[in-house]
């Protein structure tokens, strides 16, 4: 029985490379000369530091550009609020969302079941497994999910016959 998995994954190495590129660009740009602007990473949690709110927004824009150039979807970034650090410095927490959450998984399964396609969808941890009798029906399901869930980056893996 053909099946595929709906997942949401981010390549951690590509995120690391993008952060290195951001830090390199910030250190060489004239408008950041003498500032302490940088991006730090610990697993899937990023912290953006800068001297002012304006510089913080600029570093955030550079981060988005570099991530998209490296193939990481920027819809997976969850930006936090601006926090004051010592003196006049500011920081912002950015979380890289991975895995299909339970709410989104339930929404995907409900969307598939409401479409009346002849497939079965089941939630397995942070993935949604979809299986059906024919390949064509599975491809219709992929098109349906792409159309209905556009606010979160999803990948379709393990397409098996």
From Swiss-Prot:
Keywords, ordered alphabetically: Nucleotide-binding
Coiled-coil regions listed in the entry: none
Matches recorded under InterPro entries: DUF520 (IPR007551), UPF0234-like_C (IPR035571), UPF0234_N (IPR035570), YajQ-like_sf (IPR036183)
GO cellular component: cytosol
Cited Pfam families: DUF520
Annotated GO MF terms: nucleotide binding
Function: Nucleotide-binding protein.
Sequence similarity: Belongs to the YajQ family.
Name of the protein in question: Nucleotide-binding protein Tbd_1846
Organism expressing this protein natively: Thiobacillus denitrificans (strain ATCC 25259 / T1)
Higher taxonomy: Bacteria, Pseudomonadati, Pseudomonadota, Betaproteobacteria, Nitrosomonadales
């Amino acid at each position: 029985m053909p099946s595929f998995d709906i997942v949401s994954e981010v390549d951690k190495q590509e995120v690391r490379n993008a952060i290195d590129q951001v830090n390199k660009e910030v250190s060489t740009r004239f408008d950041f000369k003498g500032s302490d602007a940088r991006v730090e990473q610990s697993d899937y949690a990023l912290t953006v530091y800068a001297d002012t709110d304006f510089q913080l927004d600029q570093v955030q824009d550079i981060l988005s550009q570099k991530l998209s150039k490296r193939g990481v979807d920027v819809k997976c970034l969850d930006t936090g609020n601006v926090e004051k650090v010592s003196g006049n410095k500011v920081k912002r927490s950015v979380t890289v969302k991975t895995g299909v959450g339970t709410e989104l998984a339930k929404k995907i399964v409900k969307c598939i079941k409401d479409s009346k396609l002849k497939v079965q969808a089941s939630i397995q941890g942070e993935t949604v497994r979809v299986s059906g009798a024919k390949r064509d029906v599975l491809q219709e399901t992929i098109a349906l999910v792409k159309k209905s869930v556009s606010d979160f980056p999803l990948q379709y893996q393990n397409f098996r016959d």
